[in-house]
Amino acid sequence: MKHNRQMPDESLENIKVLLNPKLGKPVKSLTSAQSKACYHTLISNKNLNKTSDEYEKLLANYILLCDEKYLCKTVIPDSRFWAILCDNCQKLRSETLVANLIRIFNVALKCQDSNKNEVIVSICHISRENSQLIGILLQLLSQRPIHIPLFTDTILCITLFLKCSLTLCETSLSHAVEFVPRILILLFQYNFPASMSELLYIEDLQPLILEEFVPLKQRLINFLSSVSIDDYSCSLKADLLTAIKDNSVFQKGLEMEMGDLPSINLLNAYDTFTFLNSPNGSFKRLYTEQLLFGENDFPLYEAIFKLSDQFRRLFNLSGKKENQYSDSERDLKLQIATAVLNRQTCFYKTLELFLRFWIESLAKSQSDLVSLLNLAIITLKYVCLSSSDLEAAIQTKSLLKTQVVALDSMRYKFARTLQLDSIKKEQYRTWSSSIASFDTMLSGQVRDYVRHQRLLQLQKGTWVYAENPLNPEAGTPKVYFLIVSDNHANLLAREFETQTNDLPYLFDNKILTSPGSEALANGRTKVVVLKHITSFKSIELTTPSRRTSSNVYIKLDEANVYTGVELKDRNDRTVLKFYLDTEEGRYIWLDGLKLISPFQHEDISEDTKEQIDTLFDLRKNVQMINLNVRQDIIVPPPEPSDEDEDEEFYNLETLKKVTQNFYFD
């Protein structure tokens, strides 16, 4: 009996020599026989961990030194091993536990034996039976200060764990439908997304998160979307029904809307479950009010299921990105990664936005639901991928906060504006190859129209200063009357001492005035040939600011703004110099002369450019209304041999016809 009691102790001493470098030679990997002996000894002496601090160290060293095949074939599939590791994990240093799990996950992924599926299933079982192991890893990432080597290994370890679950998606669907949702829910429960969002901005951690973890999570999400909840037996369905029953408002909503839970995919179920288990107080209040007082109940579950599918498509990293939302590929990845990592937060906020849109738009039908779904997705796309605030948010490391605030503050009217812009961009993109020639033609037409508009104004004539009105030595500055000739070839100017009561007029290419005002005129009409003007020089002149008198309640700064204009010929000689005293005068005369000039002048004012752009968009939008946007109903052009067939596609001639009999107001 004494000999039998000492055997475990003697065996334990033997493995100390193999596993503890302090007592023997430098540590080497164990052989298969040594691995077997050590494992049996550790299992037999598992209760020693309650009385000795050496046991967990031996266990940790054993995991690192165990023969790879034995570890894969015997140790990992053994539930006793996981129970022992779970009992001792709190005593191990964080670095040691992470290193042990990395070894286990790597060995399992590399396993080529027929029992690989059993090995992977055993690892995924810890999400249910020994979830504190993964919980410790997730909690490590919320600790501060940030220890880069430990955090890098921890993220790698979690990534390997997800890779194990992804392997099940290929080898055992029945197990995958059970464990993949459970693992993602485990990450959600430990607030893992928030921790990763903060670490996303750490330069040393960013590549691992962006290139490894985020795409991996998205692949798991894609898997969930491909499997119906009724195809396999899984606990998620029961958990979802329990979550619905635990909240009377949401249970009533399901009964009124659908009666029973329909056949949905696992991703729909996962998104619904996490939503019901989120802090959704504001949504619940708004939804309850809508059920009580709204005329048309919000179809909550149909909205969740549809939004779930659209959300996945929008942030699908594995798919082709048709649009680039940022000039920087890195910034784009950060934006998508933030949305993928914080899927539940963004999903919840978008669903709340969906509900607000339903109430504000007085929606009531299925077509309204589809329309608002598109509106919500376009809004989400703008907020998460293309908003002008995102660049600053990336710099301040507050991308998620910026996205959440933007969704909370989004207004229905502005969202509809975003939707209109999106529709126009999609239509332009679809027809870009066919419409390029039309754009060139339309641009010329719009510029000609604005040119003609200015010409009509220039032919009415105007008073301008002939001398600098801000020159105190000039006294009362003389003035010019300017007008463009009937043949549009000349700019005519005549100097006057001051403005006349009667507006001068043009006759035979000369500026004339009434006999009573002729005494105020100086000299003859000056003719400036427009084709001789090669450049327009302008400078803004401002009087010193002066305040209103002190006996008024509101004091305003007053300042007069003038524009000095010089018309120069090819030799840089000034052929005419005058001063405009209003913004309107600058807008009409300076831009107008540039537009009617035979030379091309691009330096027109922003107001005129805006007018041209607005008119161009107006004309283009009118003709785009009649064009289909769906690719499947765009008839391709016929082959060159089909000359006798009618043209059933939109080409330049068709686009020209669209704008016939169209006039600007």
Swiss-Prot record:
GO terms for biological process: actin filament organization; autophagy of mitochondrion; intracellular signal transduction. Forms an active heterodimer with DCK1. InterPro entries: PH_domain. The keyword Cytoplasm applies. Forms a transiant heterodimeric complex with DCK1, that acts as a guanine nucleotide exchange factor (GEF) for the small GTPase RHO5. DCK1, LMO1 and RHO5 relocate to mitochondria upon oxidative stress and trigger cell death. The DCK1/LMO1/RHO5 signaling module mediates mitochondrial turnover under nitrogen starvation conditions via mitophagy. The DCK1/LMO1/RHO5 signaling module also plays a role in cell wall integrity signaling. It is found in: Cytoplasm; Mitochondrion. Disruption phenotype: Leads to hyper-resistance to cell wall stress agents such as calcofluor white and Congo red. GO terms for cellular component: cytoplasm; mitochondrion; plasma membrane. Keywords: Cytoplasm, Mitochondrion. This is ELMO family protein LMO1. It comes from the Eukaryota. Present with 486 molecules/cell in log phase SD medium.
